[in-house]
Amino acid sequence: MAKLSPRDIKRKINGIKNTQRITKAMKAVSAAKLRKAQALLYATRPYSNKLYELIEDLAVYIDRESHPLLEKREEKSVDLVIITADRGLAGAFNSNVIKTAWREIQRLKSEGKEVSLLLIGRKGVNFYKNKGFNIIEAYEDIYRDQVNLTYTAKVGGILASRFIDKKSDAVYLINNELITSSTYETKIRKLLPLESTASSKKLEEVSVYNIEPSKEEVLSSLLQRYINYQLFRALVESSTAEHSARMLAMDNATKNAGEAIRKWTIIFNKARQEAITTELIDIINAAEAIK
């Protein structure tokens, strides 16, 4: 490697400083977006959990076979909803989902099951679209505007129709979920069919309620809402975790840039000192020659 002049080193330091300013600004933007996303997420979770509890309790009282969205059957065909981000610069955020989904696909295929994918997020779409899988739908740019229930109702309708028509025997969500402001985990959750874990105590508690017009009709109306809202929650979880991951990635990049600036500043000072020393020696030698 050719030795750099002090001017070249100074130019490199200035370039790193420009990059550092960009990563610092991106960190600030991600932090602001994270706070906004967390407010939505913390409002979403209680409703989602309560809706699940309500459906779980109602499902105890009816024959599962009487409602197509509750029917449990052998999983010969599985739909996977893979949720990634549209953008990068978020550390291992997207690769974690892609790798987890890939392992799950290979596991299911090794068991002789058919796998179909519904992809949400450009990173996942770009990775899986040319891998030879059956792609149900592929969505990009969904995070440009705030995720809404109109969008998730469309996706939920597609998944419910496939399950009812027996094109799939189970539906799973694969996405990142926020654990703390600085940590997230990649989760695989079953969306369909709904699995009830209600206890006998719950059975006694719910049996005292009078439900109009009937448990079956109320449950039927809630099930599609449950599917739509679970998708909504998964997207909000993913979006919030993305902002957290990007904020941390940009924070690390800013710190690394600072370390690089310090390193190159030392090199610059040494190079400048050497240049000054060389110039002084040349001046002394020239003066000696004149004598």
UniProtKB/Swiss-Prot annotation:
Entry superkingdom: Bacteria
Main location: membrane
Keyword Membrane: yes
Gene Ontology MF terms in the entry: ATP binding; proton-transporting ATP synthase activity, rotational mechanism
Keywords: ATP synthesis, Cell inner membrane, Cell membrane, CF(1), Hydrogen ion transport, Ion transport, Membrane, Transport
Record-level GO cellular component terms: plasma membrane; proton-transporting ATP synthase complex
Topology class, membrane: Peripheral membrane protein
InterPro entries attached to this UniProt entry: ATP_synth_F1_ATPase_gsu, ATP_synth_F1_gsu
HAMAP family: ATP_synth_gamma_bact (MF_00815)
Family named by the database record: Belongs to the ATPase gamma chain family.
Function: Produces ATP from ADP in the presence of a proton gradient across the membrane. The gamma chain is believed to be important in regulating ATPase activity and the flow of protons through the CF(0) complex.
Name this protein carries in UniProt: ATP synthase gamma chain
Upper taxonomic lineage: Bacteria, Pseudomonadati, Aquificota, Aquificia, Aquificales
